[in-house]
Curated annotation (Swiss-Prot):
Location, primary (coarse class): cytoplasm
Any single GO CC term annotated in Swiss-Prot or TrEMBL for this entry: ruffle membrane
Annotated ranges, domain Rho-GAP: 788-1001
A GO term for molecular function: zinc ion binding
Low complexity: bias regions: 458-470, 673-682, 1087-1099
Domain F-BAR: 296-566
Recorded domain comment: Rho-GAP domain is able to regulate RhoGTPase activity, actin cytoskeleton and cell spreading. However N-terminally BAR domain plays an autoinhibitory role.
Subcellular location: Cytoplasm; Cell projection, Ruffle membrane
Coiled coil: 403-526
Organism, as annotated: Pongo abelii
PANTHER family in alphabetical order: RHO GTPASE-ACTIVATING PROTEIN 45 (PTHR15228:SF18), SPERMATHECAL PHYSIOLOGY VARIANT (PTHR15228)
Name used for this protein in its record: Rho GTPase-activating protein 45
Length: 1163
């Protein structure tokens, strides 16, 4: 195609120009040609210069109207009709089929589509400065250069066609095709920049269509329809460009589409429309890529269009209606959202009361958390809807609509005013023209009459000359008057013409101004709609994004529940009396005055004198029955000393399952005191199920200890209230002055209580849940604990580990190591918040024995998560994550090398290498961070060692603690994509630290109790004392093999724990109950050698007492038992003299040994 066009052009002997009107016209000279070409080249650069390196998006395509707009031609003076006007050259008919492709301009070079006969303007100069005829090259060298460039462009299109339509390299064809298209467009841009007159609408439109077809082409499928469309687009751009080159060489350039710029308005020149850039570059194709024309081109197009202002005003009016419809839609939708959120809140409130009414229900914590999340979602949605209505959408859009309507009406009024002025001027012009015509006719008639009178006077006789003279004079006066009137009418007519021209020009000025103002108003409204829409959908995303995470969390937590777990817990917590044994024996009839031997035997089956009180010291031992009547020999009377118990003395007929004997009324029920010296409400020695596991007989004399001092019963104004264990440690009195409650953090005015020693204030109703113990000194103010810098919290601890970490870890290790899902299952939010508040109010004095293990673990995770900088500093994050990535990559490579089979030795080598590298990196941590991290990981290692029970593997703990202990430096985004991607790597680091704890911190982790046992079930070893049983070494009593999980969960069995006593009693079968009814559980030893030394465990409060005793001691060298008994003045001492051999629970059997030389032992 291009070669044929080239041959035709080379055969052209000269360059001629056809005149559309058919009349001959002078040909332009050579210098004129050159100057015209120079002017054309000096115009702004083609927008293809702005094409990005990658391909632009599909250009929009619209069909332009083939209409000639009014007001575009220049008004010529009446006397200049002989001058040839600006040429309006007609497009060759052979190219008329491509006119529809020029729908609208794609460049900023003012190439507007105004019909088939319109072309882009030559320059940006005013119409008076334009040449009257088109320009073209005059030198053969220019033609040869142009044809060479055209040949390069044709070669680029051929390469593009081959690349797109080839059948091989399916995957590599797309980038190769884009590269070929970019090369062809680059050549085309160079040609247009060199010859600006080739920048036609048809060429740019065809280029946009070709770009769209190439980008939308499916290279992986053989679609004939797409290939046909691509070939058609390729042919279209070739034909359009070759036609432009032909017209350029023939000189057929149309300049009739120039903008009619109002005189005197320099701001509307083409230079100012394109901007004051250094090179005058017009708007780039980026604007076209975005789907809209540059603002200046839109105004110019409407200026040339008939009724352009009315069309713009109509669009502005429709836009105001559109904004109103948007506001209506969002109002209705937000109303529905508000109703749903309020209904959800109301439903959650009502259901929460009914759902949480009964404890120990299946998945109760899951649904409690779900209800809390529903409440939070409803509250957040209500706030979001309120924000939408008042700040981000409704109000701004409503104000913008009102302003939009106001400005539209003002612009419309100004436009109509200008139109009315022009109409008045045109009406005056028509009237003046009519008057002028009438006066001229009257003047002509008067002149005719004067001429006729003169002829009559010349033909009359000399005697009648006076009458003719008078008639002539009269007609001359009339002719003079008619002439004057005609001149006045002509002057009026000229004035009206000038006024009409002025009003017409003013109308054009008003049109330009109105279009600019309308577009400004529309753009402002567009921006407001855009901002409001972004704010709306962003807010909706923020409200709905957490929902999938919450549902996934609830799903994972629900998977950890075992069916029947809550029912078992409910049965274990039942405080019911034992069902009495009913015997159906034959009883022969006896007389009314005689008793049956069977009845006498039943009445004498229990002798209460076996239960020796303080006054029974020195009395001979008596034989009595135990739980099932098995005889047990007692030795307490022969000991000659009294010791104190750390639990209450309680006897009950129903609880013991025995009939009361004589003297049973001498026993009183005492309540146990806590180790801090005051009463405890929940430590009464009563089995939760009301069973015989801790009978009254055992309670009265367990471990051979009898009360030495009376235990104080709670007194004062709150003695009849239900007090928590921590509340019973305070000396309470009525509140005297208003204060803030340390439990619920609200003010107390009436019905309040305060401690006489620590001045703690609390509501009366809050005493049931109070978790802060009495410190026997004034309680300090509230501490900002959560969210505080870690160095401040660790500064107060001697070893660098904050007290909250120690407190939570110790409590979990004491009674929740074997709890299933520990750290994985979330606690109840309200209880967790109360515990956090208690830690900030009471610090180390918080009582955790009544808290749920999951709540305690949640508090610990929350504290670590809210640290401004995690335990593992930000500066180590990227190195640790990179190390985890390398480790995972190495494992994957090793697995691939072994053909998919996991080699444990290679994986272990990779993990050990990673652990060594972790050890080197963690040495850079601050001392307090490293100490706390080591303390926490030692605890997690202990949890992993019993993973068969708690189901918490190192991987699970890594998933939980990875984002908590190791997280990147925070950014502006709520959740960055990189942090989500790094979750597996964070978990990998923590998992390696747990598994290789000893290698990382260069010490061996402590083994849990039972770890030294040869049996594989890892049962806890229980050391018990049998004060009333004399047996030699090697006496063995079998135990039940099936013990409840509750007994195995406790790592250290304390003498102060009721649950430990209850669990130990459940370990014994009914056949050995008589022999083991007075067992005392001691702490398990760390090794086989230390088992014989019977070193007991200490609770947190006992350690506090020992520390105080050492500080207040007088330096004597008394035994620890003497110092402790001297310190405990109002509570039972924990001194236990155990001269008899200890009993050990090993492998489901109890082994007794003899050890006569025993020292007092701390329990």
């Amino acid at each position: 195609m291009f070669s044929r066009k080239k041959r035709e052009l080379m055969k052209t002997p000269s360059i001629s120009k056809k005149n559309r009107a058919g009349s001959p016209s002078p040909q332009p000279s050579g210098p004129h040609f050159i100057s015209g070409e120079t002017e054309a080249v000096s115009r702004p650069e083609n927008p293809f210069n702005e094409l990005p390196s990658d391909l632009p998006k599909e250009l929009p395509r619209k069909d332009g109207a083939d209409a000639v707009f009014p007001g575009t031609s220049l008004e010529l003076p009446a006397g200049s009709s002989g001058v040839k006007a600006t040429g309006t050259l007609k497009r060759p008919t052979s190219l008329s089929r491509h006119a529809s492709a020029a729908g609208f301009p794609l460049s900023g070079a003012a190439s507007w589509t105004l019909g088939r006969s319109h072309r882009s303007p030559l320059t940006a100069a005013s119409p008076g400065e334009l040449p009257t005829e088109g320009t073209g090259p005059d030198v053969v060298e220019d033609i040869s250069h142009l044809l060479a460039d055209v040949a390069r462009f044709a070669e680029g299109l051929e390469k593009l066609k081959e690349c797109v339509l080839r059948d091989d390299l399916l995957e590599a064809r797309r980038p190769l095709a884009h590269e070929c298209l970019g090369e062809a467009l680059r050549v085309m841009r160079q040609i247009i920049s060199k010859y600006p007159l080739l920048n036609t609408v048809e060429t740019l439109t065809a280029a946009g269509t070709l770009i769209a077809k190439v980008k939308a082409f499916h290279y992986e499928s053989n679609n004939d329809l797409e290939k046909q469309e691509f070939e058609k687009a390729l042919e279209t751009i070739a034909v359009a460009f070759s036609s432009a080159v032909s017209e350029f060489l023939m000189g057929e350039v149309d300049s009739s589409t120039l903008l009619a710029v109002p005189p005197g308005d320099s701001s509307q020149s083409m230079e100012s429309l394109y901007g004051s850039g250094s090179e005058g570059t017009p708007p780039s194709l980026d604007d076209c890529d975005a789907g809209c024309l540059p603002a200046e081109e839109v105004d110019v197009l409407l200026q040339r269009c008939e009724g352009g202002v009315d069309a713009a005003l109509l669009y502005a009016k429709n836009m105001a209606k559109y904004m109103k419809d948007l506001i209506s839609y969002l109002e209705k939708r937000t109303t529905l959202e508000m109703e749903f959120a309020k209904g959800l809140q109301k439903m959650a409130h009502n259901c929460r009361q009914s759902v949480t009414q009964e404890p120990h229900m299946p998945l109760l914590s899951i649904y409690s958390l779900a209800l809390e999340q529903d409440l939070e979602f409803g509250h957040g949605m209500v706030q979001a809807v309120g924000t939408l209505q008042t700040q981000t959408f409704m109000q701004p859009l409503t104000l913008r609509r009102l302003e939009h309507e106001k400005r539209r009406k003002e612009i419309k009024e100004a436009w109509h005013r200008a139109q009315r002025k022009l109409q008045e001027a045109e009406s005056n012009l028509r009237k003046a023209k009519q008057g002028y015509t009438q006066r001229c006719e009257d003047h002509d008639k008067a002149r005719f009459l004067v001429a006729k009178a003169e002829e009559e006077q010349a033909g009359t006789a000399p005697g009648a000359g006076s009458t003719a003279t008078k008639t002539l004079d009269k007609r001359r006066r009339l002719e003079e008057e008619a002439k004057n009137k005609a001149e006045e009418a002509m002057a009026t007519y000229r004035t009206c013409v000038a006024d009409a021209k002025t009003q017409k020009q003013e109308l054009e000025d008003t049109k330009v101004t109105a279009l600019r103002q309308i577009q400004e108003v529309i753009r402002q409204s567009d921006q407001t709609i855009k901002s409001a829409t972004i704010s709306y959908y962003q807010m909706m995303h923020m409200q709905t994004a957490p929902l999938p995470v919450h549902f996934q969390m609830l799903c994972e937590s629900s998977k950890l529940y075992d069916p029947g777990q809550q029912y078992a817990s409910h049965v274990r917590q039942l405080q019911r009396d034992q069902e009495p044994d009913v015997h159906y024996d034959f009883e022969p009839h006896v007389s009314a005055n005689a008793w049956s031997p069977v009845m006498r035997a039943r009445k004498s089956s229990f002798n209460v004198s076996d239960v020796a009180g303080p006054e029974a010291a020195g009395s001979p031992p008596e034989e009595g029955g135990c739980i099932e009547g098995t005889p047990v020999k007692g030795h307490r009377a022969g000991r000659g000393h009294q010791v104190h118990k750390s639990w209450p003395l309680s006897i009950s007929d129903s609880a013991s399952g025995l009939d009361p004997g004589p003297g049973a009324g001498d026993f009183k029920k005492f309540e146990r005191t806590s180790s801090s010296g005051t009463m405890s409400s929940t430590e009464e020695l009563v089995d939760p199920e009301g069973g015989a596991g801790a009978s009254a007989f055992e309670q009265a004399d367990l471990n051979g200890m009898t009360p030495e001092l009376p235990v104080a019963v709670p007194s004062g104004p709150f003695r009849h209230e239900g007090l928590s264990k921590a509340a019973r440690t305070h000396r309470l009195r009525k509140l005297r002055t208003p204060a803030k409650c340390r439990e619920c953090n609200s003010y107390v005015y009436f019905q309040g209580a305060e401690c006489e020693e620590c001045c703690l204030a609390c509501h009366k109703k809050c005493l049931e849940t109070l978790a802060i113990q009495c410190g026997h000194k004034k309680l300090q103010g509230r501490l900002q604990l959560f969210g505080q810098d870690f160095s401040h919290a660790a500064r107060s601890a001697p070893d660098g580990v904050p007290f909250i970490v120690k407190k939570c870890v110790c409590e979990i290790e004491r009674r929740a190591l074997r709890t299933k899902g520990i750290y994985r299952v979330n606690g109840v939010k309200t209880r967790v918040e109360k515990l956090c508040q208690a830690f900030e109010n009471g610090k180390e004095l918080v009582e955790l024995s009544q808290a749920s293990p999951h709540d305690i673990s949640n508090v610990l995770k929350l504290y670590l998560r809210q640290l401004p900088e995690p335990l593992i500093s930000f500066r180590l994050y990227h190195e640790l994550v990179g190390l985890a990535k390398d480790s995972l990559k190495a494992e994957a490579e090793a697995k691939a090398a072994s053909r998919g089979r996991q080699d444990s030795s290679e994986s272990e080598a990779v993990a050990v290498a990673m652990a060594g590298r972790l050890r080197e990196l963690l040495r850079d941590l601050p001392p307090e961070n490293r100490a706390s991290l080591q303390y926490l990981l030692r605890h997690l290692r202990r949890i992993v060692e019993v993973e068969q029970d708690n189901k918490m593997t190192p991987g699970n703990l890594g998933i939980v603690f990875g984002p908590t202990l190791l997280r990147p430096r925070p950014t502006e985004a709520t959740v960055s994509l990189s942090s989500l991607v790094d979750y597996p790597h964070q978990a990998r680091v923590i998992e390696t630290l747990i598994v290789h704890y000893g290698l990382v911190f260069e010490e061996e982790p402590e083994e849990i109790p039972g770890g030294q046992d040869e049996s594989s079930n890892q049962r806890a070893e229980v050391v018990v004392q049998v004060p009333y049983l004399e047996a030699g070494e090697g006496v063995v009593y079998p135990l039940q093999e099936a013990a409840e999980d509750g007994c195995r969960e406790s790592r250290v069995v304390s003498n102060d724990s009721d649950s430990d006593l209850e669990e130990a009693s459940e370990l014994l079968s009914s056949s050995e109950a008589s022999a083991l009814c007075r067992l005392s559980f001691l702490e398990q030893q760390q090794s086989e050698a230390s088992l014989e030394e019977a070193s007991g465990s200490h609770s947190g409060s006992e350690e506090q007492l020992e520390t105080t005793a050492r500080e207040d001691g007088d330096g004597d060298e008394d035994s620890p038992a003497q110092r402790l008994s001297g310190f405990n003045t109002n509570q039972s001492n924990n001194v236990l003299q155990t001269p008899l051999p200890p009993m050990r629970l090993r492998g489901g059997r109890i082994t007794l040994g003899s050890c006569r030389e025993r020292q007092p032992e701390f329990v």
